[in-house]
């Protein structure tokens, strides 16, 4: 084949096209035979294969640091797939699975999904690790897997210095078909689980997980003359430049015209060029186009011949809004000048920024400095705009959404920000925030006064906002910690920064009606004060005490090293925020065993009883943290083999002794539960869970057990029902309808939970408050997250951990007199109040009160509330900010209140 090189360097005006992001696509060539399978991609067939040049990170479609290239073709008998996996830390890859259908996905692994039909199921799931260990399953319905399905297919792997490779040969019979013809279409996905850096990559664009058959890409079976497009570059730069480069191979004896189309979403701009490729030749291309769009954009590249797509790729990228901000600031300067303001110095800044912005097209690396200059200019313009409003004051007080994590450089938006208007049920907490932006050249020492007419001062807590590191690696600060103001209610705001007054207003003991007042900010050194008015409407509805959801935050409370000054204050804080399930570590009740499994001396329950007696008045005592695993360790130390007669005897006697002791403390079976194995998602871990569960049933059939399930496999959940009394699936499992049905059909109690480190980065609305709405949506009895308090680092500190975000799990901070609350922790409690308000409406609907129109409207409101979790997830995926998410829930709460009042008449 001779090389015919075509360079297309294009800076063009884009055409407009309304577009919807399509599925990814790839047309693969037909070859006569498979390669010699040795795990090395050096056979000549691979050089002619279709190429997937990169994977996208799940779930944000980012770029992995460890690249993966995938090669695909087919033969009369099989589909052949090759993986070339780059890895910078080969000494840290995981290859624990040795046997077929072990937990291969927990290793560094490659996952292949095949859906030959047009329906979401059945689809086939194949996995291999770097040892060539295989896992396979058929999903006969979405969420319903059968891991006993073991078809014939082959994988070979090879390990190198800087990565590893794999060759797959998948006969058609392995995926339920007898053969294929040119033009046939399958829906597939190719994925990689990389462990040293913890990167999950996918060819298809997914929402949350690999198992999304509706989002699998299109695999088209071509013929021997199918052109091959190999992309070497596909990037979107922060200056709006989109670069594509690669080569097109034409194995046909006829020339072809390849259409190279790039569409930019969401605005639908198109860049379109034709690349001619001579017979049996290769043409190189390089395309450069600049979009005028800004914000989060997606470039979709498609190469097609005769209207048939050969390949389709996407590349998300972000363009900071330099041009639009500059235009807006210029217009604001013009308005200031017309109003008589002295703006000459600002004009000079604006000209300097405009000059720097001219170089953006050639130097995308200059963007950061231009953005910083824009930030400085905007603050200066804002200062000039607000000077008349604040009558020469050095600060501006403005109403803010209390759930938005404040940053020191935040600026007030335009519009009237002088008033806060909110409503609440009787007995509910109300949250409000007033931000204070400094225009001074020195730190401001301010005093806060907050009051509402006819409301006792004790009903209002004044907090300030303390900035903490967002995580161990970030230099970014967020206003998460909310310490109580000092006795003088002082607020210190550094120069040119923004601080916050955070109010927690209790409506307990208040009558229904309007409560009006203000938050006043005044310099301690004298001068004019500023006010933000507050109007609180207390509704003629009592927030019900029932239902009382089960709330658990797992981490210890009374045994945290950084909370030793007054641990009972932290327990009170947890209880005040609804926590009523408490973990008692089984290490506090250790039995001494002999080789026959006999308990050789009385168990010392001293440490256990200290916790149990403290927690028992407030809710369930939970033998958490895998009592089975803890016992297994003790048994091994005594030389007892797993599940031997001595093992069984020791466990049963220990559990019976423990339960008898709990009863001696005045506790009944309704007061305690046992977790057998924490998150037993692996094959061996799950079998262990089942074994220990059966021993628990033998020890005491009345003792209740709980399963924290971060897996959604249908068959496993059906098995687990035998030994599970309380289901606690991870909240992502709730998206699996088949799994939820298994748990619901068991008739047993069901909660949900989440667990994520780096918790300061988690959104107060879409992570913390969200849980209660999700629990209501699925009619759950409780929910939880890890953790209210974590025994790791002091939450005021965030230490870097080998480049990974591993800050802290805690939701409160240690203070001089007990816990300092956080925005996240209060959002969690707000969700608890939402949950009870939603249940009140549900109860009123069931009673059938009110007019037919009111009842019909209430049912529609309830349906809207049940859809709120899905709406929040979509908003989060779309990058819609916290304030809009909070406004969605607050708007729904207002509708719920209105309908509840109507049905109460």
Label each PLM-derived region with a short phrase.
Residues 226-235, 311-338, 534-566:
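Low-complexity, Pro/Ser/Thr- and charge-rich linker/hinge segments at domain boundaries
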């Amino acid at each position: 084949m001779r090389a015919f090189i075509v360079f297309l360097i294009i800076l063009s005006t884009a055409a407009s096209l309304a577009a919807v992001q399509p599925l990814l696509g790839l047309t693969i060539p037909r070859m006569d035979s498979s390669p010699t399978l040795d795990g090395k991609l050096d056979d000549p067939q691979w050089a002619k294969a279709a190429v997937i040049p990169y994977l996208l990170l799940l779930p944000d479609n980012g770029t992995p640091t460890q690249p993966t290239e995938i090669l695909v073709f087919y033969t009369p008998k099989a589909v052949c797939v090759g993986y070339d996996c780059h890895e910078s830390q080969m000494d840290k890859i995981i290859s624990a699975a040795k046997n077929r259908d072990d937990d291969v996905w927990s290793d560094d692994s490659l996952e292949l999904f095949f859906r030959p039909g047009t329906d979401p199921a059945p689809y086939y799931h194949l996995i291999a690790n770097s040892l060539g260990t295989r896992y396979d399953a058929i999903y006969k319905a979405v969420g319903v897997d059968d891991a006993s399905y073991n078809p014939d297919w082959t994988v070979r792997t090879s390990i190198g210095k800087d990565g590893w490779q794999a060759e797959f040969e998948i006969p058609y019979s392995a995926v339920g078909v007898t053969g294929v013809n040119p033009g046939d279409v399958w829906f597939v996905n190719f994925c990689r689980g990389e462990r040293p850096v913890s990167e999950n990559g996918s060819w298809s664009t997914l929402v949350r997980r690999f198992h999304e058959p509706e989002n699998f890409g299109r695999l088209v079976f071509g013929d021997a003359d199918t052109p091959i497009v190999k992309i070497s570059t596909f990037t979107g730069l922060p200056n709006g430049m989109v670069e594509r480069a690669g080569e097109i191979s034409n194995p046909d004896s006829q020339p072809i015209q390849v259409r190279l189309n790039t569409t930019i979403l969401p605005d639908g701009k198109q860049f379109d060029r034709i690349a001619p490729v001579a017979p049996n030749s290769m043409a190189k291309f390089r395309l450069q186009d600049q979009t005028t769009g800004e914000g989060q954009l997606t470039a979709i590249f498609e190469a097609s011949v005769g209207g048939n797509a050969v390949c389709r790729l996407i590349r998300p990228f972000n363009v900071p809004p330099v041009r639009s901000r500059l235009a807006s600031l210029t217009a604001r300067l013009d308005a200031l000048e017309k109003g008589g303001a002295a703006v000459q110095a600002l004009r000079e800044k604006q000209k300097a920024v405009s000059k720097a912005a001219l170089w953006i097209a050639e130097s995308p690396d200059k963007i950061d400095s231009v953005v910083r200059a824009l930030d400085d200019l905007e603050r200066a313009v804002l200062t000039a705009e607000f000077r008349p409003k604040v009558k020469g004051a050095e600060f501006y007080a403005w109403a803010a959404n209390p759930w938005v994590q404040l940053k020191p450089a935040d600026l007030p938006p335009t519009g009237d920000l002088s008033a806060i208007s909110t409503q609440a049920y009787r007995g509910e907490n109300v949250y409000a925030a007033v931000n204070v932006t400094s225009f001074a050249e020195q730190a401001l020492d301010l005093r806060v006064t907050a009051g509402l007419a006819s409301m006792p001062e004790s009903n209002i807590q004044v907090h300030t906002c303390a900035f903490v590191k967002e995580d161990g690696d970030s230099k970014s600060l967020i206003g998460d910690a909310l310490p109580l103001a000092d006795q003088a209610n002082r607020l210190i705001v550094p120069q040119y920064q923004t601080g916050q007054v955070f109010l927690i207003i209790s409506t307990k003991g208040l009558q229904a009606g309007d409560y009006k007042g203000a938050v006043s900010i005044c310099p301690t050194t004298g001068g004019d004060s500023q006010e933000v008015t507050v109007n609180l409407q207390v509704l003629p509805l009592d927030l019900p005490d029932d239902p009382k959801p089960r709330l658990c935050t797992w981490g210890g409370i009374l045994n945290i090293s950084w909370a030793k000054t007054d641990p009972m204050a932290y327990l009170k804080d947890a209880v005040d925020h609804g926590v009523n399930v408490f973990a008692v570590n089984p290490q506090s009740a250790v039995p001494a065993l002999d080789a026959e499994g006999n308990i050789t001396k009385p168990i010392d329950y001293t440490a256990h009883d200290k916790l149990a007696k403290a927690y028992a008045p407030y809710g369930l005592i939970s033998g958490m943290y895998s009592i089975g695993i803890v016992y297994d360790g003790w048994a091994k130390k005594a030389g007892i083999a797993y599940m031997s007669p001595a093992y069984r005897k020791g466990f049963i006697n220990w559990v019976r002794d423990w339960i008898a002791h709990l009863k001696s403390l005045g506790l009944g079976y309704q007061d305690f539960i046992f977790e057998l194995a924490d998150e037993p998602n692996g094959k061996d871990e799950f079998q262990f869970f089942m074994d220990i569960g059966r021993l628990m049933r033998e020890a005491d059939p009345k003792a209740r057990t709980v399963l924290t399930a971060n897996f959604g496999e249908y068959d496993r959940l059906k098995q687990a029902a035998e030994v599970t009394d309380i289901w606690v699936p991870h909240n992502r499992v709730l998206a699996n309808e088949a799994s939820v049905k298994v748990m619901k059909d068991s008739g047993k109690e069901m909660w949900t939970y989440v667990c994520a480190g780096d918790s300061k980065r988690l959104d107060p609305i879409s992570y913390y408050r969200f849980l209660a709405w999700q629990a209501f949506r699925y009619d759950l009895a409780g929910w939880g997250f890890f953790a209210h308090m974590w025994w790791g680092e002091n939450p005021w500190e965030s230490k870097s951990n080998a480049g990974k975000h591993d800050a802290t799990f805690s939701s409160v901070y240690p203070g001089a007199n007990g816990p300092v609350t956080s925005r996240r922790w209060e959002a969690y409690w707000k969700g608890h109040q939402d949950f009870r308000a939603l249940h009140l409406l549900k109860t009123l609907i069931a009673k059938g009160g009110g007019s037919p129109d009111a009842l019909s409207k209430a049912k529609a409101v309830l349906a809207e509330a049940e859809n709120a979790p899905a709406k929040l997830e979509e908003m989060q995926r779309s990058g819609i900010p916290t304030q809009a998410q909070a406004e969605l829930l607050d708007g729904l709460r207002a509708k719920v209140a209105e309908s509840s009042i109507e049905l109460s008449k």
